[in-house]
Swiss-Prot record:
The active site is at 132 (proton donor/acceptor), 160 (schiff-base intermediate with substrate). Belongs to the DapA family. HAMAP family: DapA (MF_00418). GO terms for biological process: diaminopimelate biosynthetic process; lysine biosynthetic process via diaminopimelate. This is 4-hydroxy-tetrahydrodipicolinate synthase. It holds the Pfam family DHDPS.
Amino acid sequence: MFHGSIPALVTPFKNGAVDEAAFAALVERQIAAGSAALVPVGTTGETSTLSTEEHKRVVSLCVEVAAGRVPVIAGAGSNSTDEAIDLVAHAKAAGADAALVVSPYYNNPNQDGLFEHFRAINDAVALPVVLYNVPSRTVVDLKPETVARLARLPNIVGIKDATGDMDRVSYHSALIGDEEQFVQLSGDDPSALGFLAMGGAGCISVTANVAPELCAAMHLAFEDGDLESARAIERRLINLHRAMFCSPSPGPAKYALSRMGLCGPEVRLPLTAPDAAAEAMIDAAMALAGLNT
């Protein structure tokens, strides 16, 4: 269903407001570069500091600009089950192909609570849902056993796993079985190639905002069985992967895009822009990747 390089799109701002023209241009750039799908308003899209109206508008705009050329997996998570259902329902109404739903954060539910949260979403809206497990941000880990229970629900089609634990790919597969055709996507750029080798289908990527052609080429090389080329591309990208988190994300990605003249570097508080040392690290990583600024 979903595979390859999938950018977790930044949401550009200009003078405090969403820069719709810049966002539309970024979507066009991603499609031209060979990205396999698009994820608007996820963590990298600063969903936590968007108003509900802004969130929904960005999803609608992404679907409108993509115009069916690639799938749109709309960010739609919340620590309120009712709000998550509302966002998933909007994603469906807007024409998104799926919703990316993060585990509830801050309120720290147990595994039964996580299961019931996602089951409520599954039951409320007939739209494919990709689970999003990122315990470094949500505090709670969506355990493989819970993922396996959820995979048996009709609308739960996959997971974005940002734990960096590649054992999860095999463990999920062993628990779920092949008959479910459950899609596993990495949420950790530095380990994405290893994730693919373990049986993953793709990566929802921060780095792909900045280097979409290289990220797409790495995935295509792997899919073609050309591991030497895939590894060579990954070596070009590894410093950029690390630089994308040298300051709170998505500040580094936005700074890099601003250096390329593609959008402004503005982030919303409580995030702040990268400092001079971080900027130097990003510049160096871009140069090593062969990106023009």
